[in-house]
């Protein structure tokens, strides 16, 4: 190849890859949604059923005690009709800890690799590797942001010293490959890796694990993943991938909760898109998670079903049948028949702080529907006397609100402005991490 041809060939390769990613984006988001803009008035019919109305075998909820009595029924209904059961109980055990870099990121952080083993009551075990990044210039104990990575530790933390994963990952994940910058161009500069320096500078640690070690995002591999946990993948109540990821987050919390360098009440969940669904479910099930940063979670996350705006259940069940319970597909053509919806999921996290992120041109994720769900979930925070201040306009970000929504321009993805808002929100509620008063 002559030197003159190399730039041309490289350009053609990048254009070809970009076209491929554009096709992938169009498959995930219909073209008409790429030119639509979210309704910032968040208008729509009344959310039904109302959160505290009679139902689930109980009278109307009028007190905090009533609400606590209703919680188990709501969780059971969410598992049965949307997410599938949680995997059986297990405890995380540290097998080995390795110091990767004592002064990474220009001396800002210490990187460790932890090999974990999840031990079930029947003696069965599965392994999970994670990385912990500790800021060197912040006093401890530290709050920690938990992140599930689809590409592995090296890609998420931008250091080859963590090594390439053996488990399943998508083609755009290769560190230094051509696809990574294309993914960043289309889905945002932080879709594969968070702004590590900014997070460390704010005094937060990072805990990252490769999700595919326990739950690969592949329909063909999901049954095998469940079988490793001793589960029958053919039962109606088998865990969907979102449920499996949420369970893994709790197992990582088992391990982090034993590290005295970290705040006992300082576990913060972050997720984007499908992982944003999982962090909401994890926090709804496990009160150890003190805060949730959920970005563009869409259908099966914070957005309401049946709005007629975002991704319908029929589409998500056809494209990703392994994500949810088998029963969920039965609501594909009658979403309003679901006995539970996003406002129930959000309410189970009360009174802890939750940030919902959206984008103006990401109507497939239906940010207006997520905002309406947040307003419908407000009574749960009110019962805890934790709903003041409260964000009441979709286009006015109020980081001090316990359930807030941040909107930016653009499409589906993770941008620097998303992370600035998330860190501002975390800072606004940091005092809550210190006192740990978040009883649901």
Residue ranges and their predicted role:
Residues 131, 140-150:
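Short beta-strand element of the alpha/beta-hydrolase
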Residues 148-251, 255-258, 305-306:
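Cap/lid segment of the alpha/beta-hydrolase catalytic domain
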Residues 375-440:
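C-terminal catalytic histidine-bearing segment of alpha/beta-hydrolase fold enzymes
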Residues 350-365, 408-409:
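Conserved strand-to-loop "acid loop" that flanks and positions the catalytic carboxylate
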Residues 251-311, 334:
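Primarily recognizes the serine-hydrolase "nucleophile elbow" in alpha/beta-hydrolase
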Residues 291-345, 366, 370-391:
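Mobile cap/lid helix-loop segments that gate and shape the active-site cleft of serine hydrolases
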Residues 1-20:
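N-terminal Sec-pathway targeting helices
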Residues 54-56, 60-136:
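Non-catalytic accessory segments flanking enzyme active sites
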